[in-house]
Design a protein with these regions (language model features):
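N-terminal Rossmann NAD(P)H-binding glycine-rich loop of SDR-like oxidoreductase domains
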Residues: 9-29
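C-terminal substrate-binding subdomain of Rossmann-fold SDR/epimerase-dehydratase oxidoreductases
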Residues: 58, 205-284
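NAD(P)H-binding glycine-rich loop region in Rossmannoid oxidoreductase-like domains
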Residues: 61-99
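Conserved Rossmann-fold NAD(P)-dependent oxidoreductase catalytic core, especially the SDR/UDP-sugar
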Residues: 79, 105-155
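Short alpha-helix in the Rossmann-fold core of NAD(P)-dependent oxidoreductases
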Residues: 82, 92, 97-104, 111, ...
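A conserved pocket-lining segment of Rossmann-fold NAD(P)-dependent short-chain dehydrogenase/reductase
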Residues: 89, 144-152, 178-186, 200-224, ...
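Flexible, glycine-rich beta-alpha linker
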Residues: 127-129, 155, 179-196, 254
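Active-site Tyr-X1-5-Lys
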Residues: 150-179, 206-207
Length: 284
């Protein structure tokens, strides 16, 4: 993190899993000026309570769908904002679209106006769509597979894909310095747990409740721990080539290729040992 010394950094979506961990890691370096952007001030004050009085820490309370309300000059904007909750995909799809598409446009316009600085767009491996069975490894060019338009996650993956297209358009037309980081499934510690499968499984298992899986067959996927994800995104931010895409994944380091049902079994076994409960994994 010392490589960011002397830099002014904005992190959108800073109360989320990746954004909050990224901010806390960068704040370990006192020579970095950090501004976080989030919608919920109470969450900000809770997650970052240890930094509120630090001279190198500021926060903006606003929705990323609106133009960024700041006069600061940022060397880096890490655009982490955007919902990852399946409930939000299903119930508020327009909000998902606006957050991903308007959000990146507002970041790009900010950097374009100030005339310097780099944007790191956090995208997702979901832009690769449903891969062939047992085809886990992909490179950055493998984007020809797409989901059906009635898929519940389509709104997320396609708005991420569109955000990438917009980012590259700004790079081509205005030479805006932007790189794209496509994350595999990120898991790990968060002060505020997101509403995703792994965190919900952990809650249920620790309460001694069974984990009910709605399907019987699950594809294996790459999973990456949050600390590794943060290290890699910082590496990409510092050394990545403008206009390029970088996969952020474990590449099966530590046997991190696993399906969601395999992960559920690991969670249940660990919780049963810790809490002396008898939770189980069941498939409908």
């Amino acid at each position: 993190m010392e490589s960011f010394a002397g830099k002014n950094v904005l992190i959108t979506g800073a109360t989320g899993l990746i954004g909050s961990n990224l901010a806390e890691n960068l704040l370990k370096c006192k020579d970095v000026q950090i501004t976080i952007l989030a919608r919920n001030e109470n969450k900000v004050k809770s997650i970052f309570r240890n930094y509120l009085n630090r001279a190198n820490f500021n926060y903006l309370i606003q929705d990323i769908k609106e133009p960024i309300n700041s006069i600061s000059k940022f060397d880096f904007i890490f655009h982490c904002a955007g919902s990852i909750s399946p409930d939000t995909f299903n119930n508020y799809p327009v909000e998902v679209l606006n957050s991903n598409i308007k959000g990146i446009i507002n970041c790009l316009e900010y950097i374009k106006r100030q005339g310097f600085g780099r944007i790191v767009l956090l995208s997702s491996a979901t832009v690769y769509g449903n891969r062939k069975k047992n085809c886990i490894t992909v490179n950055e060019k493998d984007t020809e597979y797409i989901d059906k338009t009635d898929s519940s996650s389509y709104i997320y993956s396609e708005s991420k894909r569109m955000a990438e297209i917009i980012a590259r358009a700004y790079y081509k037309q205005y030479l805006t310095d932007v790189i794209i980081a496509r994350f595999s499934y990120v898991y790990g510690y968060a002060r505020k747990c997101p509403n995703t499968a792994i965190f919900n499984f952990i809650k249920k298992a620790l309460n001694g409740e069974d984990i009910i899986l709605n399907n019987t067959v699950f594809e294996r996927r790459d999973n990456i721990y949050i600390t590794d994800a943060v290290s890699l995104i910082c590496l990409a931010a510092l050394n990545g080539i403008s206009g390029e895409v970088y996969n952020i994944s474990s590449n099966n380091y530590g046997n991190n290729y696993a399906s969601i049902d395999e992960i559920a079994v690991h969670i249940v076994n660990a919780a049963n040992k810790i809490k002396k409960t008898n939770a189980r994994v069941k498939k409908k």
